[in-house]
């Protein structure tokens, strides 16, 4: 029987990481939990985010996952190291992979980070980036409206273009040549963000680098699945199954996917 890779996020954003993982590892089975009922996590305090992250983690661990991907930057900043220390399966977040990808891309060591309020206030990206390259200069910008635009399914709309333009205006006057999408919801806005920032700026989706690290970690622990056993992906949400499904089936190209509603916490 296949063991799944578990993915957790505050909503649908982590599906951007799932998509990259399934591109690289098509034989793997995915269990995904999006806590859309309590989304967004960005404005919440660290202790509350850590509590929610543990609730999601325990739900998937109880279902026998072989690895956990915290596919949410805010949750990674709040709880990655505690969860990694206490679980006996491999655990990975999205901040270190995103930082490594940005440092590969930048030519002038000036990097912008777009994130939730929680991620920006945590200083997780500047810490990770400067830990890898002390010369790097980091401009962080909280974009709290982006998550609601994505969760409402408006990420291709004129509203999205307006919100992106208004939110990113402060970055246009900087000399950054690379921008990290420091929230897994943001890659759904990547075409609009790229268009606004212009050709001279590389826009980094940490999902690709995270997928590569998932593959390497599974290989290291001898957990890669190359069998042709039937794959049964499972998707769980604490919010509306229909809204989740509408976004997920489009993003993952899974028209027949089934989404299960669950409750977490009290």
From Swiss-Prot:
It is an enzyme of class 5 (isomerase). The keyword Cell wall biogenesis/degradation applies. Keywords: Cell shape, Cell wall biogenesis/degradation, Isomerase, Peptidoglycan synthesis. Pathway: Cell wall biogenesis; peptidoglycan biosynthesis. It comes from the Bacteria. GO terms for molecular function: glutamate racemase activity. GO terms for biological process: cell wall organization; peptidoglycan biosynthetic process; regulation of cell shape. The keyword Electron transport does not apply. It catalyses: L-glutamate = D-glutamate. Substrate binds at residues 9-10, 41-42, 73-74, 184-185. The active site is at 72 (proton donor/acceptor), 183 (proton donor/acceptor). InterPro entries: Asp/Glu/hydantoin_racemase (IPR015942), Asp/Glu_race (IPR001920), Asp/Glu_racemase_AS_1 (IPR018187), Asp/Glu_racemase_AS_2 (IPR033134), Glu_race (IPR004391). Pfam families: Asp_Glu_race. Belongs to the aspartate/glutamate racemases family. Provides the (R)-glutamate required for cell wall biosynthesis. This is Glutamate racemase. It comes from Listeria welshimeri serovar 6b (strain ATCC 35897 / DSM 20650 / CCUG 15529 / CIP 8149 / NCTC 11857 / SLCC 5334 / V8).
